[in-house]
């Protein structure tokens, strides 16, 4: 049985993850962590997730929760995820990170922790989205430079980072498939008199509002036709399901940074 610690266990994603982990054969919730001062401290993680008691009380001490654990699932913030990665490295516990908004410095710190333990770091744990990454890769390769690539994403009004990590990754995938450097190709939310669109550019537009779980569309705009690849999330459950799948896959792997393409066996599509 793989023992799983869930951080942010009382949040919207954390409660979904607790439910999915307890429903996944071979996985068990062994620990639940929240920030210091959270009203969830001391409460049963299973009850907070809307189910039967698990006998696992939420605590604010990750180091203590890691004792005897095999893997941590972390959907908190990129700042907290860096601290959690460092704690996991010190304890020798694998880590699945679904947080977004990572700066280059934060990613470097996660990579440093991954020299000691295996880490899955993915901007989107949804199986469907990771299939979309591969579809975009193939479409960009086949359609080539004759099609302009644009990306539009929309999320709920509470999402703090923009654009979404998924939108950025979609742009990176398209750029790499077209032989372009993402740092040069990606353009975010245009404004003003900019002149004609550069042919090498990949635009990313961000919308926020309501309770939209997440929607991403990649447009390949050619002369006389347009190809659209869209993923719509209607529930956070698919993110939790993907995270549980990653948690079952990761323990025992060599140290290093992995993503959902590794978990799903999609590397052959590169």
Curated annotation (Swiss-Prot):
Any one annotated GO CC term: cytosol
E.C. number(s) listed in UniProt: 1.17.1.8
Binding site for (S)-2,3,4,5-tetrahydrodipicolinate: 156, 165-166
GO biological process: diaminopimelate biosynthetic process; lysine biosynthetic process via diaminopimelate
Keyword Ion transport: no
GO molecular function terms attached to this record: 4-hydroxy-tetrahydrodipicolinate reductase; NAD binding; NADP binding; oxidoreductase activity, acting on CH or CH2 groups, NAD or NADP as acceptor
Keyword Oxidoreductase included in the entry's annotation: yes
Record-linked PROSITE patterns: DAPB (PS01298)
Localization (cell): Cytoplasm
Annotated residues for binding of NADP(+): 35
Enzyme class: oxidoreductase
Keywords, comma-separated and alphabetical: Amino-acid biosynthesis, Cytoplasm, Diaminopimelate biosynthesis, Lysine biosynthesis, NAD, NADP, Oxidoreductase
Superkingdom of the organism of origin: Bacteria
Xref: SUPFAM superfamilies: Glyceraldehyde-3-phosphate dehydrogenase-like, C-terminal domain, NAD(P)-binding Rossmann-fold domains
One of the Pfam families matching this protein, by short name: DapB_N
Signal peptide: none
Residues reported in the UniProt entry to bind NAD(+): 8-13, 34, 98-100, 122-125
Role: Catalyzes the conversion of 4-hydroxy-tetrahydrodipicolinate (HTPA) to tetrahydrodipicolinate.
Protein name from the UniProt record: 4-hydroxy-tetrahydrodipicolinate reductase
